[in-house]
UniProtKB/Swiss-Prot annotation:
Transmembrane segments: none annotated. One of its GO terms (biological process) is response to calcium ion. InterPro entries: EF-hand-dom_pair (IPR011992), EF_Hand_1_Ca_BS (IPR018247), EF_hand_dom (IPR002048), S100_Ca-bd_sub (IPR013787). Disulfide bonds: none annotated. The gene is S100a16. S100A16 proteins, but not other S100 proteins, have only one functional Ca(2+) binding site per monomer. Upon Ca(2+) binding, undergoes conformational changes leading to the exposure of hydrophobic patches which could be implicated in the Ca(2+)-dependent nuclear export. Binds Zn(2+). Ca(2+) and Zn(2+) do not bind to the same site. Does not bind Cu(2+). Calcium-binding protein. Binds one calcium ion per monomer. Can promote differentiation of adipocytes (in vitro). Overexpression in 3T3-L1 preadipocytes increases their proliferation, enhances adipogenesis and reduces insulin-stimulated glucose uptake. CDD domains: S-100A13. GO terms for cellular component: cytoplasm; cytosol; extracellular space; nucleolus; nucleus; plasma membrane. This is Protein S100-A16. One of its GO terms (molecular function) is protein homodimerization activity. Homodimer. Interacts with TP53. Pfam families: S_100. Ca(2+) binds at D67, N69, D71, R73, E78.
Amino acid sequence: MADCYTELEKAVVVLVENFYKYVSKHSLVKNKISKSSFRKMLQRELNHMLTDTGNRKAADKLIQNLDANHDGRICFDEYWTMIGGITSPMANLIRQQECQQESQQECQQESQQESQQESQQGSS
């Protein structure tokens, strides 16, 4: 069945599987990643996209920021928030690279059109 998945579907499956790879099987708290496992995940899985993944204080700060319910563990929704926080700047970076490859004039025209639309919406 996995062979028929699209690239996007495969990417979602990888993200979900990655979460459960770091959930402790022996924990009393099910379906959550402990601080130590989360630090391991950052170091092993996101060391190219996030800076200071080996820095314990930086990892603990990220955990604190993600841990919406303040239980000291990362649930799937909190993990997904982190993924969104990574992908949004990545999307902007990819778009900037695409703009550099296209003619600057086309990107400027697109940007001007967007600005005009925003100003028209703002004056409405």
